[in-house]
Amino acid sequence: MKVAKLRVAFLVDGYLAYIQKFMLAYTYIEKGKFALVEKQKPTLIEPTDAIVRVTMGSICTSDLHIKHGSVPRAVPGITVGHEMVGVVEEIGSEVTNIKPGDRVTVNVETFCGECFFCRNGYVNNCTDPNGGWALGCRIDGGQTEYVRVPLANQGLNRIPDSVTDEQALLVGDVLATGFWAARISEIAEDDTVLIIGAGPTGICTLLCVMLHKPKRIIVCEKSEERRRFVQEHYPDVLLTTPEACKEFVVDNSAHGGADRVLEVAGADDTFRLAWECARPNAIVTVVALYDQPQVLPLPDMYGKNLTFKTGGVDGCDCEEVLRLIEQGKIDTTPLITHRFPLSEIEEAYRIFENKLDGVIKVAII
């Protein structure tokens, strides 16, 4: 009897040791294939690292780009996912901005804060080996239970006590993207702003454009379901379809086109639509990530004197975005239409990738 009890105790202890060491992680296997596999839990490598226990994550369209082979830098074998919030479990000796137990957002962009580009505010071009989009692309990301965050002093922001995980979930990527895009578009109060695309990033961009209080906002979206979502939640926004967009924008703007165009759709024909809908001397901000190369037909657009702006999400704004959420000025919780446990992430991806069941954003809990 004692031997049997000892054997059971040994097995239990062994199992506990095993589960303390391993975790489930959704992993990029090869082009076209992700899989949920067991991996060792991460440990600190550099003194600037932090270990975060993921409490909620999400699926981004960029994850689909990795799956389809459209992100050459993506490394097979990495855990995917770069949209997450969590609790700090452990910090390196040089991490001073956060402490164990803090609830934090995780920035999609990691940056050193010291190189030429960081010092000049272009943190998405950070030259550190872990700089730029590393998490869930070049190093293990957050569609898992624990994640190692390099350069944690810059990459983590403490979530205010009054802000929930759901409210903060999109801060580190799509909301920061929309905030950056609206900022660099130089929106004035007399402007007509056209946003092409009403997916998750498009709606986050819309929310951030609304902070600038332009005279008129037009959203162009092909999906009737998503147009209905925008109409229900943001009734002052004008809506159109890609087929009717050019004529609609001309009819609803003062100078023959939109003053500011933000291209967030990333479809085959939306880049051309963006500059065609812009008035002369307008700013066109390209937010989208494309699967295919785009053509810049300079002879066709020469006389329009357009300014194009593009680039990666700016990781400097997350603290300000959290403050705006705390103040009730930004609310992305209506975008979270579906919730799945990590064990059902394959189903979550199926629904998100195929745009089923009215999905906007999926939370992995």
What are these regions (language model features)?
Residues 18-23, 222, 247, 272-276, ...:
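C-terminal hydrophobic helical "lid"/dimerization subdomain
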Residues 97-100, 189, 280:
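Short, flexible surface segments
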